[in-house]
Amino acid sequence: VQALDFFPTFMEIATRKKYKNKELDGESIMPLLKGKKMKERNLYFFRAYNTDQYAAIINGDWKLIKYHSGKYQLYNLRDDISETTDLQNVYPERFEKMKKDLRNWETNVVPEYENDYRKRINY
């Protein structure tokens, strides 16, 4: 569950109908509130401030992190919650699939920006 899921949830509560808007990234969490499971989906994260970590995708137990330097790391969060063992070479198909999903998301969602915060604030 992410904060962007609240609006579709509140709309579903208010209207008693599933709120459908393709421009929203969130999904109603009504199934969870009714004690059911939500369908699995990718969760995306983006950092625009000065850090090497740039973006990440979580799918089920799996997390792929992309760095500004071009490096990637793949973790199984169920088995390695501390993210100590990079598994991209152990699970190359999963790595490539998640990398492709992250690239598609970046293309469609992430705005162009200046990633050096010193330039953004005229430092």
Language model region names:
Residues 9, 83-86:
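A general alpha-helix detector
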Residues 12, 35, 90, 100-104:
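Residues within well-ordered alpha-helical secondary structure of globular protein domains
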Residues 80:
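Intrinsically disordered, low-complexity polar regions and short flexible loop motifs
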Residues 97-115:
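Charge-dense polyanion-binding interfaces
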Residues 57, 95-98:
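Hydrophobic packing residues in well-ordered alpha-helices of helical domains and bundles
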Residues 85-93:
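Active-site-proximal N-terminal segment of extracellular/periplasmic enzymes that hydrolyze or transfer
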Residues 2-77, 108-112, 118, 123:
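C-terminal cap/loop subdomain of S1 sulfatases and analogous C-terminal strand-loop tails that border
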